[in-house]
Design a protein with these regions (language model features):
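ABC transporter nucleotide-binding domains
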Residues: 2, 6-201
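Short alpha-helical
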Residues: 66, 85, 103, 188, ...
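Residues that scaffold the ATP/ADP-binding catalytic core of kinase and kinase-like folds
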Residues: 68, 141, 214, 286, ...
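Conserved NTP-handling cores and scaffolds of large molecular machines
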Residues: 101, 218, 241, 280, ...
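ABC transporter nucleotide-binding domain
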Residues: 166-253, 257
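C-terminal coupling/interaction segments
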Residues: 255-301
């Protein structure tokens, strides 16, 4: 379990984290989301003892990281997949870390197999793709068989097969009762991977809830329809309390009534429908609605 209590971090006049509190519980894949500069990496570094908070506490299994006994056996992390000695092989890299942490050589072979790196384990790291380096970083995180895993953008550089594999792998780790915290900018992948989400913006907590609940609470749902009597139907729908937005191509976008109610109303008036499409909001829609005011830099067209 990871517990943050009123965590704050200031860099001179800049407040990177502002009274941030949340708990990451075992048995779940928890997505950690926020715009660039929101404070995600700073939060992870403080949890791992790589930076000190200005105020508040960050605990792993009830203790600060610097007070954990055999920390690699308590929490595994991947913050930067490129932070590797390019002249070493994956096997040598893992063996060196294992030896310094009292971990046997057998475990090195196990994590190489778990992460699909066994066939390239004796190649030098400087010949690896980013996706291969991500797998090696994950192997390091797993060396101590820890109950807590923290991973910063772990799918960067992975191909489609690799992303699907890591999604199922994280779910399997959570099903074993581990605490899994994953940050990512890929909303479509987070929607498939994480069953709980923590969202921060400008160092403050914006949301802490199950994925489906966050989508339902922060995104709009609508129905797209087409009809040769669109103007007439729009008037009927508005009279029923719906909001109707005509589109340039003649379609109507309706909120406030579901597809079944719209279809029933059209049928009672003998109005033909050429299309009636319920549109489910995505995690990306919900995320953009939630974090819109926390983005520091907006593009223009």
């Amino acid at each position: 379990m990871i517990e943050l209590d009123r965590l704050s971090k200031r860099f001179g006049p800049v407040t990177a984290l502002d009274d941030l509190s949340f708990t990451v519980r075992p048995g779940h894949v928890t997505g950690f989301l926020g715009p660039n500069g929101a404070g995600k990496t700073t939060t992870m570094k403080i949890i791992l003892g790589l930076d000190a908070p200005s105020a508040g506490t960050a605990l792993v299994n009830g203790r600060r990281y610097d007070r954990l006994v055999r920390p690699l056996h308590q929490v595994g992390s991947l913050l930067d997949a490129t932070a590797l000695h390019g002249g070493r092989t994956a096997r040598l890299h893992l063996t060196s870390i294992a030896r310094s942490n009292g971990i046997g050589r057998r475990r090195v072979g196990e994590v190489l197999r778990l992460t699909g790196m066994e066939a390239v384990a004796d190649r030098r790291v400087n010949g690896y793709s980013l996706g291969m380096k991500q797998r090696l970083g994950l192997a390091v995180a797993l060396l101590g068989d820890p109950p807590v895993l923290m991973l910063d953008e772990p799918v960067n550089g992975l191909d489609t097969e690799g992303i699907g594999w890591i999604r199922q792998f994280f779910k399997a780790l959570a099903a074993e009762g581990r605490t899994v915290l994953v940050s990512s900018h890929l909303m479509s992948e987070m929607a498939l991977t994480a069953d709980h989400l923590i969202v921060i913006g400008r160092g403050k907590l914006l949301a802490d809830m199950p994925t489906a609940q966050l989508i339902a609470a922060n995104a709009r749902h609508d129905v797209l329809l087409r009809s040769p009597r669109a103007a007439e139907l729009a008037g009927l729908l508005t009279a029923r309390g719906a909001t109707v937005t005509p589109q340039p191509d003649g379609a109507l976008v309706v909120t406030g009534l579901d597809a079944a109610a719209i279809g029933d109303l059209a049928a009672t008036r003998g109005i033909a429908l050429h299309a009636l499409v319920p549109r489910q909001a995505s995690l990306e829609d919900a995320y953009l609605d939630l974090t819109g005011e926390s983005v520091d830099y907006h593009g223009t067209r």
